[in-house]
From Swiss-Prot:
PANTHER family in the record: TRIGGER FACTOR CHAPERONE AND PEPTIDYL-PROLYL CIS/TRANS ISOMERASE (PTHR30560), TRIGGER FACTOR-LIKE PROTEIN TIG, CHLOROPLASTIC (PTHR30560:SF3)
Disulfide bonds listed in the record: none
Gene name, Swiss-Prot/TrEMBL: tig
Organism of origin: Clostridioides difficile (strain 630)
A single GO molecular function term of this UniProt record: peptidyl-prolyl cis-trans isomerase activity
Name used for this protein in its record: Trigger factor
Domain writeup: Consists of 3 domains; the N-terminus binds the ribosome, the middle domain has PPIase activity, while the C-terminus has intrinsic chaperone activity on its own.
Amino acid sequence: MKAELIKKEGNKVTLKITVDNNKFEAAVNKAYNKSRNKYNIPGFRKGKAPRIVIETQYGKGIFYNDAIEILFPEVYPEAIKELDIDPIDNPDLDIEEISKDNGLVMVLNVEVKPEFELGNYKGIEIAKVENTVSDENVDAKLQEMVEKNARLVSVEDKALEDGDTAIIDFEGFENGVAFDGGKGENYNLVIGSNTFIPGFEEQLVGKKAGEEVEVNVTFPEEYHSQDLAGKPVVFNVKINDVKVKELSALDDEFAKDTSEFDSLDELKADVRAKLEEEAKNRADAETRNSVVEKVAENTEIEIPEVMIQHQIDNMLNELNYQLQYQGFGLQQLLEMTGRTMEELREERKEDAKKLVKSSLVLEAITKAEGIEATEEEFKAELEKMASAYNMEVEKIEASLRDADKEDIKGQIKIRKTIDLLVDNATIA
């Protein structure tokens, strides 16, 4: 295989890859063996026709495309490594020549990462992030624990108010006709939670168990169901029960019942320690983000549009993954908010551009400083993964592809690079 850099303009390059005829012929034979069962040739059993017979009937190049598909994943990575180029998108491929003399000659046009001059990245000044935990923070966390461990108890003859839970049956009608998804039984509705359509919960305030209420509301214009968006509807609601939270006293008994501690003082100390650790981690993360952001601001880069679009793809894939845990996806989000996919992508463009720029700058600093991931650091990362997945380190390592291992080492290098930036920053 021979690789040549033909032309470079900005971040667009043209390269030529030549594969000698022997190697190409071997790939053509592989393609023939892989697909010969597809051809029915008179006088031959299916799959038994010689290659030359199939080529005579269908054309000499019948197996060329498959042969190129076999060769490309092997020769393309070799070529870009040899030429030291870093593609950011799939290449446009043209076949220049296929001959016995020259073999397979491919010309590829591809966008690569932009070249740029690093700005100053040492001695960056950033504001110190406070990570103190106050008594009020501790008290709020303890109260949160009390709320979380509260019991719901029924109260007779209690008029509903904010914070109460109504156990209701309901059915919705639009123009007198029941609509899909508008019916429920023994539903726990917290008054004031804004779980239902705007105006629904307010009409239950002051009502008691056993009462039946006619609730008139209008669905929001941006409601995800187009059939109901903006439509006035009526819900027939029966209040089966009214429940209120019964809060435990914040004392030693509470500590014993809800934790491994025997006293409230011990529980408080543990809560404070955990809050302080969270605050420190949060402050460290904010500091690291601030340093990276400042360093990126010091460097001018013309970000290729394709890199921005790929980053937006990643961001939306992550968003979709998170939404699926809540029982819906991107399409439902768009319907609920009345936005198009194009608008959603445009909203994320600026953040995507910043992320790409930061990534390019960190990679460049890593290279400039000669930062590498040691074998010990790699093994330590595998041990963390093994602990997280409750697996043996050897099994984790055996399951990783070479590309996965390089990704892990890349993450280690970037982490060390950010450590270097923070260590050299002025934090005041």
